[in-house]
A protein has these predicted regions:
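C-terminal motif of bacterial Sec signal peptides marking the signal peptidase cleavage site
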Residues: 14-18
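A generic structural signal for short, non-catalytic loop/turn and secondary-structure boundary residues
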Residues: 9, 68, 165-168, 181-182, ...
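Extracellular adhesion/carbohydrate-recognition regions
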Residues: 22-131, 170-171, 201-215
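An exposed tryptophan-centered "aromatic clamp" motif
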Residues: 119-132, 138-191
Length: 215
């Protein structure tokens, strides 16, 4: 009986010790509406403010599968002023022309390499912080459209350009050319309604760059 009491007491001490050693650890997993800063760190908005970091983008998608590259996407805080997809008529920019592909980064490089894409050049010119921003593909900008209402508050808090519902201000270039019309048209996307529109590539329209995250 004495042995039984001793064993029970020992077990109780282990349980108490285990409880005493329990610690609450902060949740550091990246989440939608986290902030990408100019130092490359992704942090909560409150931490960005308290640490005096400079924001550059807001996380709008977390990768849950292998369909997209990296761990997620962030949207740049500001619009790029209207630019033509191409300043030369009749040029293919060798994008995939696949509206379901998450390949905006590759598409933008193809556009830039052509030497005749003002929109792609404008995006490359903003790389002062080393962030590899690019023009989203149709599939990627659809993800942004789905998260717009969630991230807009944080874009505003960070001093960025809120994604507008104004029908005259909501149209953005994607990096995806129109299949079988690659030399003439690319897809324009409404971030107000989710509508796609075939558009002549020499027309100037806004760009909202995004960034692939690998945090």
């Amino acid at each position: 009986m004495k042995l039984l009491y001793t064993t029970c007491a020992a077990l109780m001490m282990v349980a108490i010790t285990s409880c005493d050693e329990h610690r609450e650890f902060p949740d550091t997993a990246m989440k939608t509406c986290d902030i990408l800063c100019t130092d490359g760190k992704v942090v909560r908005y409150e931490d960005m403010k308290s640490q005096g970091k400079q924001p550059i983008a807001v996380v709008f998608h977390i990768n849950q599968n292998n369909e997209t590259q990296g761990t997620g996407y962030a949207v740049y805080l500001w619009d790029i002023a209207p630019e033509a997809y191409s300043d030369s008529v009749g040029v293919k920019h060798n994008t995939s022309a696949n509206i379901t592909a998450f390949d905006g980064n590759m598409n933008t490089h193809s556009m830039y390499s052509s030497g005749v894409s003002p929109a792609a050049t404008a995006v490359f010119d903003m790389w002062q912080y080393g962030q590899s921003a690019y023009i989203p593909s149709v599939a990627e900008i659809r993800l942004l459209y789905g998260a717009k209402n969630t991230v807009n508050d944080y874009i505003k808090k960070c001093g960025g350009d809120v994604i507008s519902d104004d029908p005259d201000e909501c149209w953005y270039w994607t990096s995806t050319e129109v299949k079988d019309m690659e030399s003439a048209k690319a897809w324009l996307f409404s971030l107000a309604s989710g509508t796609l529109q075939e558009t002549p590539k020499e027309q100037p329209h806004k760009v909202r760059p995004i960034i692939t995250l690998y945090n």
